[in-house]
A protein has these predicted regions:
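Bacterial N-terminal signal peptides
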Residues: 1-9
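OB-fold and OB-like single-stranded nucleic-acid-recognition modules
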Residues: 13-161
């Protein structure tokens, strides 16, 4: 299921230059979305920081280059807010993607790898369309087989931000 969810991760929506950026962080927040964009919060990891990664093409893949402030977060306990993208059936999830923007299409990933975090939680988190707050140990990934840049292990759902 993860492979299916990530099949479009490297393909971001092409937004005409005249359309202003809506929301913060990577990805595209559809202005017709019933969900408000995430707001920066003190003590919560910024999607703007996570999206400051750059990539270079090597062989048939994109290899991330993380700035020092992002590398410094590797194996640190962080809090991050985002929108759940379940990877398994059921209303409670232990393994899901957290996105910087809400999904607006059931077949597409709303952001690239810089706007997604794979999350593994100790206790199940109830799926919701509203933003959630998660705390756990962040892994900064430079060579993930699925092309992910970030993962939270040992996470715990903290409810709504």
């Amino acid at each position: 299921m993860l492979g299916l969810a990530l099949c479009c991760a490297g393909v971001q929506a092409q937004v005409p230059a005249q359309v202003p950026a809506i929301g913060q962080g990577p990805g595209y927040h559809d202005p017709r979305s019933p969900f408000k964009p995430l707001q920066e919060r003190e003590g919560v990891l910024s999607w703007s920081l996570l999206s400051s990664v750059s990539t270079k093409a090597e062989k048939n893949r994109l290899v991330p280059t993380f700035p020092a402030p992002v590398q410094a977060l590797n194996q640190k306990k962080v809090k991050v807010q985002g929108f759940m993208m379940p990877l398994e059936p059921g209303d409670k999830q232990r393994h899901f993607l957290l996105s910087s923007v809400p999904t607006s299409c059931s077949f597409c990933v709303p952001a690239g790898a810089e706007g997604l975090i794979e999350v593994f939680t100790q206790q199940p988190v109830r799926y919701t369309l509203e933003p959630v707050l998660v705390e756990g140990v962040l892994a900064v990934l430079s060579d993930d087989p699925y092309g992910l840049f970030y993962r939270i292990n040992g996470g715990q759902g903290l409810g709504a931000p």
